[in-house]
Amino acid sequence: MSTETELQVAVKTSAKKDSRKKGQDRSEATLIKRFKGEGVRYKAKLIGIDEVSAARGDKLCQDSMMKLKGVVAGARSKGEHKQKIFLTISFGGIKIFDEKTGALQHHHAVHEISYIAKDITDHRAFGYVCGKEGNHRFVAIKTAQAAEPVILDLRDLFQLIYELKQREELEKKAQKDKQCEQAVYQTILEEDVEDPVYQYIVFEAGHEPIRDPETEENIYQVPTSQKKEGVYDVPKSQPVSNGYSFEDFEERFAAATPNRNLPTDFDEIFEATKAVTQLELFGDMSTPPDITSPPTPATPGDAFIPSSSQTLPASADVFSSVPFGTAAVPSGYVAMGAVLPSFWGQQPLVQQQMVMGAQPPVAQVMPGAQPIAWGQPGLFPATQQPWPTVAGQFPPAAFMPTQTVMPLPAAMFQGPLTPLATVPGTSDSTRSSPQTDKPRQKMGKETFKDFQMAQPPPVPSRKPDQPSLTCTSEAFSSYFNKVGVAQDTDDCDDFDISQLNLTPVTSTTPSTNSPPTPAPRQSSPSKSSASHASDPTTDDIFEEGFESPSKSEEQEAPDGSQASSNSDPFGEPSGEPSGDNISPQAGS
């Protein structure tokens, strides 16, 4: 008997522990399962229902509870007992059923219950306030056991419903926001489907963009799956327009010059290419039309592609392929090279070099020889002598009078950067023969038949007997009356005839866009006579054009007198220099 009693006590103890464990498990999933369907069922007795004035209040509930208990005590004296019920707690609320009949007596939804109160005098009694605004009632119930589990279940039910409602509202709000975002994105896609910036916003960075694959350059390019450096790509430049890429040019350049320093060469090529492309900005500054030189390239990349008529060996210099080759230039002509764009900004520095005797690099080309690159010393380097007059004294407007009829082109007044083509000198017998004078006179007449000289600027004179000239119709005749007359060395005469680089068909179109450049003489006292004697045709043409009938007598004179007469821009008609007109070179 004792063993059976011990077994029964052990079973009851384990059942209580299980119920406690079940009561302690109050997770969300467990509570949902607990209150789902019919919910939790409790046995109880209905104390009564009382109307109250407020929806909540502890004192209010206590007063209502004492009032209902007094009513029950009066009924008990009459032999009436409390009604036995069972109540269920679920998501539907609190339902009160009659224990005998099982009929539903009262049903209060969760949202109708506003307050729950526990009786402080009886641990088995509790009550709650339910109803709508203006119709609140207090329901008092006495449970068969302690009322605390029922109160805890009601609290858990309210908390669970509140959390579920809150989560549902958040989900609805998130879904609404998502729908709004989708609507906005849909509007963007419909209106700005071609804009790659909006495409990058809508799609991820690694996705393929919606754009035309034909277009190679876009200001904004969405990165593809293979290229993820950034959203915006810099437009790619295409310097070569004739089918040759920059890689092809680099390979050709490396093959042609294997022993040169590539970074330095590329800088030099870039500067030379700018000089080639800048020629079109300053008017007609290219070579004369009769010289068959390649045209100026349209793009920088075309300058380094050799043409069919100009093939040079691989050992040639870097700039031999640039269209400055003088292989097609006839002997006896002075080649007019391209003026670098940086020369215009360095005019004061060049004038300083002219006065101080500095020697700018001049490329001299011999007949049949390879062209020499810019910046290298010439085959016959010549020192520079100080120019007796100050170059660039008059503004550019002084060379353009009001009535200008086909003046000399400004490109003919080349500065110190003009390369000179030296030709072999002729013998004394050839120069003094009358057979050579006739072709020269004919050539001089044909040369100057198309020229109309412009009126020169006013030349200030220091002599008191000569008045200041003005740009009138008499200035032209007064200017040429000075030919053969000794002038002061300080007179500024920019129309130095010996510096004019002329060809038989030189264009006479005025180059008004190119600024005036100083043209200092680039020969030493020892070299000047040789340089003038090596090119007698040019000097004879000019002097015979200005009424010098006895050139044969000048050519028969010794070399010293010839150097003195040639150094004077406007020689004496008889070929005999005056005392005032002797050049500093001859004097020294």
Swiss-Prot record:
Pfam families: DAB2_SBM, PID. It comes from the Eukaryota. It is linked to Spinocerebellar ataxia 37: A form of spinocerebellar ataxia, a clinically and genetically heterogeneous group of cerebellar disorders. Patients show progressive incoordination of gait and often poor coordination of hands, speech and eye movements, due to degeneration of the cerebellum with variable involvement of the brainstem and spinal cord. SCA37 is an autosomal dominant form characterized by adult-onset of slowly progressive gait instability, frequent falls, and dysarthria associated with cerebellar atrophy on brain imaging. Phosphorylated by FYN on Tyr-198 and Tyr-220 upon reelin induction in embryonic neurons. Also phosphorylated on Ser-524 independently of reelin signaling. Ubiquitinated by various cullin-5-RING E3 ubiquitin-protein ligase complexes (ECS complexes) following ligand-binding and phosphorylation, leading to its degradation. Ubiquitinated by the ECS(SOCS7) complex in the cortical plate of the developing cerebral cortex following ligand-binding and phosphorylation by FYN, leading to its degradation by the proteasome. Recognized by ZSWIM8 through a disorder targets misorder mechanism that eliminates misfolded DAB1 via ubiquitination and proteasomal degradation. This is Disabled homolog 1. SMART domains: PTB (SM00462). It comes from Homo sapiens. The modification Phosphoserine is found at residue 524. Residues 15-26 have a biased composition (Basic and acidic residues). One of its GO terms (molecular function) is signaling adaptor activity.
